[in-house]
């Protein structure tokens, strides 16, 4: 079993940005003490939903502040920055940390990012796939060049070279069938969403495995991650109530940060996300409290045993043994750390990998 910690850098109304940054640093350091293998940093711009515009810089700080902890991005919005600059950052972190950096990528969901950085959101999928191909080739070859409809530049040597054999490990934040199939073609591990239930996670893995096997990948050695909103307390009601205010603001901030869910939005390539939002509305989840209540049904929020039951159900359904949690809904920094430590002592030791013979 492996365990990760998502550091959201969301700014609740009662916190200053300086307080959010202090929380990020402290939780990153404490994560290593609490037995987490990896912390994951999210890229967001122009919204209190996440204050981390450059996860590479934050990753460098946390890698320098820890000894064994892996630090990953979940995820870099791949199409909005030049692929050569990105590989330079990735390789530098890979070298300086001696292989402790994890390169999580996505194609992006927030309209303003694309407008400000001068990228056409309608082409986000094609750009992300193109950028990944260039970056991955650069990781292994040490050089990059491009001559296609999206980008053109002459062959250049990328410094420094990667430290890890084959480059820093790459992960994909995957929600739609299209992204799942694309990740499977390359055998890239997915970070699965915390907003889908066990049956949906199982179906996503089945689709991935079918495609990955067609491309010759060993599906038993791909390090997928299950992601969760997490709050652990011996009092189940307290665990849920302490999260409610934070999650209410956080969910609303998420919806308000993009226009992709508006019926009037005509951006191409986001039919899955729009359809998922329509399903939420039909289920009554547009109401914030109802959405939170549903989140509690599929995320480890409650007593240690309740958390074990929810996570173990997903492990048994998917075979995934890399569990990534986000604890920041737990209130103050001290309350967040208390929840992390209780998770370490009363949840981590009792989660079991699915037996290989029963995996698929």
Curated annotation (Swiss-Prot):
EC number: 1.14.14.3
UniProt keyword annotation of Acetylation present: no
Gene Ontology cellular component annotations, sorted alphabetically: cytosol
Domain of life of the organism encoding this protein: Bacteria
GO biological process terms on file: bioluminescence
Catalyzed reactions per annotation: a long-chain fatty aldehyde + FMNH2 + O2 = a long-chain fatty acid + hnu + FMN + H2O + 2 H(+)
PROSITE patterns listed in its UniProt record: BACTERIAL_LUCIFERASE (PS00494)
Keywords: Flavoprotein, FMN, Luminescence, Monooxygenase, Oxidoreductase, Photoprotein
SUPFAM superfamilies, A to Z: Bacterial luciferase-like
Any one Pfam family match given in the protein's UniProt record, by short name: Bac_luciferase
KW Flavoprotein (keyword) present: yes
GO molecular function, a single term: alkanal monooxygenase (FMN-linked) activity
Record text on subunit structure and interactions: Heterodimer of an alpha and a beta chain.
Family named by the database record: Belongs to the bacterial luciferase oxidoreductase family.
Additional facts recorded: The synthesis of this protein is regulated by a complex control mechanism that has been termed autoinduction.
Annotated function: Light-emitting reaction in luminous bacteria.
The protein's name: Alkanal monooxygenase alpha chain
Organism: Photorhabdus luminescens (Xenorhabdus luminescens)
């Amino acid at each position: 079993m492996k365990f990760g910690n998502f550091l959201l850098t969301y700014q609740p109304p009662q916190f200053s940005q300086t307080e959010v940054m202090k929380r990020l640093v402290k939780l990153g350091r404490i994560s290593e003490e609490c037995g987490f293998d990896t912390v994951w940093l999210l890229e967001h711009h122009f919204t209190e939903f996440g204050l981390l515009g450059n996860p590479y810089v934050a990753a460098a700080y946390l890698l320098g502040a820890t000894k064994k902890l892996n630090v990953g991005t979940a995820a870099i919005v791949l199409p909005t920055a030049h692929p050569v600059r990105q590989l330079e950052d990735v390789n530098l972190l890979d070298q300086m940390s001696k292989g402790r950096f994890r390169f999580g990528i996505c194609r992006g969901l927030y309209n303003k990012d694309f407008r400000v950085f001068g990228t056409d959101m309608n082409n986000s999928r094609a750009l992300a796939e193109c950028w990944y191909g260039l970056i991955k080739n650069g990781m292994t070859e040490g050089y990059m060049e491009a001559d296609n409809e999206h980008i053109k530049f002459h062959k250049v040597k990328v410094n420094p070279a990667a430290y890890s054999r084959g480059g820093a490990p790459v992960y994909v934040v995957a929600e739609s069938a299209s992204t799942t199939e694309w990740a499977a073609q390359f055998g890239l591990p997915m970070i699965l969403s915390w907003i889908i239930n066990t049956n949906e996670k199982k179906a996503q893995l089945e689709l991935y495995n079918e495609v990955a096997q067609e491309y010759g990948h060993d599906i038993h050695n791909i390090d997928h991650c299950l992601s969760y909103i997490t709050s652990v307390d011996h009092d189940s009601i307290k665990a849920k109530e302490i999260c409610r205010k934070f999650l209410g603001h956080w969910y609303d901030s998420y919806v308000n940060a993009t226009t992709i869910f508006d019926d009037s939005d005509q951006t191409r390539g986001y039919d899955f996300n729009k359809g998922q939002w329509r399903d939420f509305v039909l289920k009554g989840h547009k109401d914030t409290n109802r959405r939170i209540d549903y989140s509690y049904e599929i995320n480890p929020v409650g007593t240690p045993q309740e958390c074990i039951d929810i996570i173990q159900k997903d492990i048994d359904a998917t075979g995934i043994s890399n569990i990534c949690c986000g604890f920041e809904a737990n209130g103050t920094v001290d309350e967040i750390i208390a929840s992390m430590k209780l998770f370490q002592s009363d949840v981590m030791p009792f989660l079991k990998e699915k037996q290989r013979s029963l995996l698929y």
